[in-house]
Amino acid sequence: GNRMELMFRDEETASRKHTDQTLAELLKRHRACVSDLVPPELIAAYPGEQSVFLRMALSCLADADHTDTAAAYKQAPEQEQMPPLRAEERLAALDRYVSALGGDDARSELRRQMYAACRDAKITDGFAACDSPVGSGKTTAVMAHLLEQACKRNARRIFVVLPYTSIIRQSVDIYRKALVLPGETPEDVVAELHSRADFEDIETRYLTALWRAPIVVTTAVAFFETLSSHNPAALRRLHELPGSLIFVDEAHSALPIRLLPLAWHWMNVLADEWSCYWVLACGSLVRYWELQPLSGLSMPQPEIAELVRPDLQRELSRYESSRITFRWREKPIGRKELPKWVQEAPGPRLLILNTVQSAAVIAADMAAEFGQTHVEHLSTALTPEDRGNTIDRIRRRLADPEQLGRGLLQF
C-alpha cells in the first residue's frame, strides 16, 4: 500500500537527484546539532560500518524508551523472559521428529540424505547457500543445519525469512511440532510474525513483535524493512538481530532487484561485524551476489559454500522433475475446453492461474463439470481460516489412496 510505496520511493529519478544534491548539507546540519551529545571523535573511533552501528544504538535507545514508558503505564508484560534457544536439545528433538517420518521409498531416502548433508555441513564463514528443489525437505534440513551452527557459534536466535504469508503457517506448524521441548509453550518458542498472524494473548503478540522468541518466522518484507525502518515499532527490535542465524528462502526474490545492492551490503556488515550467519536458499537459486552490480561493489565478496554436494543436488532435481510434470499450451484455450484439457492429465493435478478472479471462475467451471467434491479452490481471495481448512482438506485427500486412484483430485 502507501507505506510500501513510500518505503521504496527512491525509485523516482527526481527523488534520488534531490537527495544527492542536498545530502551533504543535511549531514552537516545533523552533525552540528548532535555534536555536543555525541562527539564526532567517539563515532569515528568505531572501526566498522558506522551507519549500522548507529542504527543498532538507536534501536537500543528506542526499545528502552518504549519499554520504560509501557512499564510506567503498566502496559508492559509482567514477564518478558522468553525461552532460550537450547540449540542442542532442539536439534536432538528435530532428529527424532525427522526419523519418525519414516518411509522406504526413493523420495524418503533422498530427503534423509538431504537432511544429513545440511545438518553435518561444516561451514565456518558468514554465508552458505542451499540450492535444492521444492519437496526435498529444506524446511527441516536447513533448520537442522542452523541448530548445529547455533551450538558452535553460541547463537542468540534463529530467523526463518519466507517470501509469502501463505507458506509461513505450514513451516510454523512443522517447527512447533518438531522443536518445542516438554513444558514449553509453542507460541513462545516459534514466533509467527506477519500481518495475518493470530495470537493467544496480548503479551505473546507484544513479545513476538519485538523478536524476543528463540525462533522467529517472518516475511521478507517485515525482516528487511526492520533493517532500514524509521518506525519505532520496527526499529526497536533491530538490536535483537546480532548473533543470530538467518535462513532466507527464495533468497533471490526476497527484495526488488533495485534494493539488493544495499541489502547485500547490510548482510555482509551483519555477518562480519555482528556475528550473523546467513543461509540463502531456493528451489533454483540465482546466485545474485555473483552478478556484476554486486560483485563490483567496493566490499569484501564472501566465499559462499553449498550445504548440499553437487551429486545430491542433481539426484534431488532428477527425482523431482520425474515426480512432477509441467504441462502448458502454446495456443489459447477457451473456458469450456480448459476443464477437459486438464482432465486429460493423470491426477492429482494443480492448475495455476494468473489472478484470484480467474481462479474462482475456473474452479466454478470445473466443479460444474466434475462435481464439487472433486475440485479444491485455493487463493488469497479466501480468508486465512478458509485457506487453512482447504490446505488441510487437500492433504487428507492426497493421503487417501482411493482419492488418488480415481484420478479426479483437482485444485
At which residue positions do the language-model features occur?
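Interdomain hinge/linker at the junction between the two RecA-like core domains of SF2 helicases
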Residues: Y277, S284-E344
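Inter-Walker segment of RecA-like/P-loop motor cores
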Residues: V180-S228
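Accessory nucleic-acid engagement/destabilization modules that flank
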Residues: G1-A93
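Conserved helicase motor
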Residues: T165, V190-E203, N354-Q357, V375-D392, ...
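Conserved Walker A/P-loop ATP-binding site and its immediately adjacent core
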Residues: A155-V180, A197, R287, V356
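SF2 helicase catalytic motif II
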Residues: V221-F224, A234-A271
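Conserved strand-helix element at the start of the C-terminal RecA-like helicase core
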Residues: R157-I168, E344-A367, E376-H377
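Walker A/P-loop
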Residues: T124-L146
